[in-house]
């Protein structure tokens, strides 16, 4: 009978866990819908910003301005890279499947790839899980910030990028990339690697959706060319990080929703298995008791 009590306890424990994971799935689903809407709107703004870049560059070239002196812009193919900063974005919480692990693996892969080319790499971390991993493994992270990936905030992202831009303009780094797990759809996330500094001319055209972004854009640049481009570049770099944070958050909720759905289904299967084991054990106990009773009756005859 002790075995039956143990199985009953296990069934009760698994059912409680099932309720928790199901509730977490519902919460993640609700948060995902909101995050997806924010990501969609932010994507539209990012396309508008790209369109402004394209429009200004086109007008400058039409005016005969071919050589751009701004430090933000470089021909990436001709640039000699010696130092790279990697900004990675992970979640502040777990229970989201391989969401954080996949990002960390990509960061490590990129780091090793650069080091094989004798390129110095510095890490800048956003998200508790990623920062904890690298800290635990003795890997230095230059800047660490938590509670930003779970609550994207433009001002905090802007403040974070100020240090990055200062290091880039002062020559402490030659290239800055962002690595994060992005939202593709309700059930799929994908690792994204984006170079944000220097801004190569081809980056402006990496989102070829002119009907969505360029249709209503009309810009009249005033002031020096470098001032215009520097101002736009600062906004572009800041918003690139902010959009990555929003994209990452939507992907995180998607991954957690899937993970909790899988956990809930696994709990259901485990309850079924334990219930079968319980019924078998109960039947065996009843059979044993009947055999013992019959044996006792026979002994009394």
UniProtKB/Swiss-Prot annotation:
Keyword Ion transport: yes
Record-annotated membrane-spanning stretches: none
GO biological process: proton motive force-driven plasma membrane ATP synthesis
GO CC annotation: plasma membrane; proton-transporting ATP synthase complex
Family matches, as InterPro entries: ATP_synth_F1_ATPase_gsu, ATP_synth_F1_gsu
Any one GO molecular function term: ATP binding
This protein's record includes keyword Transferase: no
Signal peptide range: none
Topology term for the membrane: Peripheral membrane protein
Family indicated by similarity: Belongs to the ATPase gamma chain family.
Described function: Produces ATP from ADP in the presence of a proton gradient across the membrane. The gamma chain is believed to be important in regulating ATPase activity and the flow of protons through the CF(0) complex.
Record's subunit section: F-type ATPases have 2 components, CF(1) - the catalytic core - and CF(0) - the membrane proton channel. CF(1) has five subunits: alpha(3), beta(3), gamma(1), delta(1), epsilon(1). CF(0) has three main subunits: a, b and c.
Protein name as it appears in the record: ATP synthase gamma chain
Organism: Helicobacter pylori (strain G27)
Gene name linked to the record: atpG
